[in-house]
């Protein structure tokens, strides 16, 4: 595509996210249920701490999918009708890892709920980032679901390699999740 989308979303400390408690419950293993009261209280506490300290970032760009051909049978199948994609990385920042370690030392229950809160927040950042590309799509193009290293048979080790495609090496330490959104 001829248009260029710089595609960086940076949110500073104090960023608020409206997180779906059913999604948090799903990450904790609940099937269609709500968070139980203790988990809901821990989730609210974790979210408050995260909102006050983390710096969420999303960075990516559009590129040819030939770079990924042959890396995974499942990825090749996912890309079979595609000509280009959006390679992007998402992070809640290094402070998130520090909080998760601190929560692990305080309470494994809080650490588990905190991990679920982080996962839902990352999912929302991914969805928001991908939605930012919708106005740039040409007639007949659309987005497919994201496909990340670790999905299907795509080796999780590819995560570090995909990060090189979206950000300078010195920033990779803060980019724990890389995704490939597909244009069809």
Task: Please identify what each model-predicted range represents.
Residues 8-11, 23, 126, 131, ...:
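Low-complexity, compositionally biased segments
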Residues 4-111:
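Active-site helix-to-loop segments that bind/position phosphate- or nucleotide-bearing substrates
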Residues 2, 10, 92, 140-184:
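Short terminal or interdomain "cap/linker" segment that borders an active site or interface and mediates
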Residues 34-38, 42, 114-117, 121, ...:
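Catalytic cores of large soluble enzymes that bind and process phosphate-bearing ligands
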Residues 82-148:
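Conserved mixed alpha/beta catalytic, RNA-binding, or beta-rich assembly cores of soluble enzyme
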């Amino acid at each position: 595509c001829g248009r260029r989308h710089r595609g960086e979303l940076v949110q500073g400390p104090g960023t608020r996210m409206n997180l779906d408690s059913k999604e948090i419950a799903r990450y904790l293993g609940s099937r269609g249920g709500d968070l139980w009261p203790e988990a809901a209280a821990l989730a609210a506490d974790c979210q408050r701490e995260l909102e006050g300290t983390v710096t969420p970032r999303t960075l990516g760009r559009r590129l040819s999918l030939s770079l990924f051909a042959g890396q995974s049978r499942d990825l090749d199948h996912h890309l079979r009708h595609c000509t280009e994609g959006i390679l992007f990385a998402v992070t809640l920042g290094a402070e998130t890892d520090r909080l998760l370690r601190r929560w692990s030392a305080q309470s494994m229950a809080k650490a588990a709920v905190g991990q679920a809160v982080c996962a839902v927040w990352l999912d929302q950042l991914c969805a928001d980032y991908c939605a930012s590309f919708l106005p740039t799509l040409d007639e007949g193009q659309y987005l497919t679901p994201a496909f990340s290293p670790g999905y299907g048979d795509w080796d999780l080790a590819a995560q570090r390699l995909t990060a090189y495609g979206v950000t300078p090496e010195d920033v990779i330490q803060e980019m724990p999740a890389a995704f490939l959104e597909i244009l069809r």
